[in-house]
Regions:
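Outer-membrane pore/translocation modules
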Residues: 45, 137-252
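Outer-envelope beta-barrel architecture signal
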Residues: 52-58, 106, 115-117, 134, ...
Length: 390
């Protein structure tokens, strides 16, 4: 993730801070690039979408954010009593459900942008003092195209709920609490959207504020999403006792889908010749069902040995096709050079598969078969943003 963070920063710094300076030279390569960045769509109907000259913008934001995962497991195993009586073996199964969730974080943020580009940084305030947070975002939001990169790294105690049915006559266990040591929850998301109606609809009008939607319009969207998620906690913590010392879960997914986005404009007042007097209120609702074509889940387990160091075992599950969901809603009010926006989003990513339990985990009484795993990563956020254009 460290290399990913450096790459993300370079992606933003080069176009945002270098291009505007070089763009002053006539007919230069950089001038063509900045034109593509700041005014990528020459098909805009100016009666429906008002795109002012590109400007620098600065926005501060407050956000509520929560991310977590829930997982269900089923384990097949053969139990042979080791009581000297020669009892018959039994084919049994055990099951568990685990829910890991970070708390609702209060986040402050700063976004700096030029034209359709912006770089964001967020930081958790208040809450658990053991929490640490790194959150970066890079957005390229044009009227008809969108590319958004988000990276979250939260380290904090993890709330858990677990239910375990062991099979045979070993009973049932239920527990909930918080890990003693901070766990880590990391997410990298890359979203790309293409709007089929690029003449009268501007996706960036609500979520970037760089253009103004003059009248209501909607469009069908095509979207691509990449997700890489990680949940990790201390191997000596209570959670690692659940399933063979499992203390780390990773998922990687690539999804494609189509949906619909609509901008509703209940009020608009055009600016005067001096550029002042702009008043605009726009609402957006976006829904994109997606099919996950690449769906990989891996778990890392630690096996304590009677002698020597613990053994680490990593199992990789290549899951089946799944339907995931992306929902987003927002509103923005613009007046002259200022704007205030609210937005909310909900992302859900499913995974499912099975893997064989390593032979080292079996003993004289218990021979393990396969673990069947299904689960989901979820993330929601709600934010308020206040910005100004220079």
């Amino acid at each position: 993730m460290l290399d990913l963070r450096k790459t993300l920063i370079l992606l933003v710094l080069l176009p945002v801070f270098c291009i505007p300076a070089h763009a002053q030279r006539p007919d230069s390569f950089w001038r063509k690039v900045v034109h593509l960045i700041s005014d990528p769509s020459m098909e805009l109907d100016t009666g429906a979408v008002y795109q002012p000259a590109p400007r620098w913008s600065v926005a501060v934001s407050g956000e509520l954010h929560q991310a977590g995962t829930s997982m269900e497991n089923k384990l097949d195993y053969v139990f042979t009593p080791d009581d000297g009586a020669g009892g018959d073996s039994e084919l049994l199964d055990a099951s568990s459900s685990i829910r890991l969730m970070g708390g609702v974080d209060k986040v402050i943020g700063l976004q700096v942008g030029y034209g359709n580009l912006s770089l964001g940084w967020n930081h958790i305030v208040g809450g658990d003092r053991a929490s640490t947070n790194t959150s970066f975002s890079f957005d390229y939001l044009a009227p008809g195209y969108a590319l958004q990169l988000q990276y979250f790294d939260f380290r904090r105690p993890i709330d858990y709920e677990m239910k375990i049915a062991l099979g045979h006559d070993w009973g049932y266990m239920e527990d909930s609490g918080k890990t003693e040591k901070p766990g880590r929850m990391t997410t990298f998301i890359a979203d790309a959207f293409y709007a089929f109606n690029r003449r009268t609809f501007a996706y960036s009008a609500v979520y970037k504020g760089n253009v103004i939607q003059r009248r209501s319009a909607g469009t069908w969207l095509f979207g691509v999403k990449y997700l890489q998620g990680l949940v990790e906690y201390d191997p000596d913590d209570v959670l690692s006792d659940l399933w063979f010392g499992m203390y780390r879960q990773d998922t990687r997914q690539v999804s494609f889908g189509g949906g619909f986005s609509y901008n509703l404009v209940p009020f608009h007042r055009q600016p005067g010749a001096d550029g002042k007097g702009l008043r605009n209120l726009t609402f957006n609702l976006t829904a994109i069902p997606m099919v996950t074509l690449f769906n990989q889940f891996s778990s890392t387990m630690r096996r304590e040995m009677e002698e020597g160091d613990p053994v680490l075992v990593k199992n990789v599950i290549n899951g089946k096709l799944h339907v995931n969901y992306v929902f987003k809603a927002g509103a923005i009010y613009s007046w002259d050079r200022f704007f205030v926006g609210v937005s909310g989003s909900y992302d859900r990513y499913n995974y499912r598969g099975s893997t064989a339990v390593p032979e080292d985990f079996s003993d004289d009484e218990v021979e393990f078969g396969r673990i069947y795993t299904s689960g989901r990563f979820c993330r929601w956020s709600a934010s308020l943003k206040l910005g100004v254009k220079f």
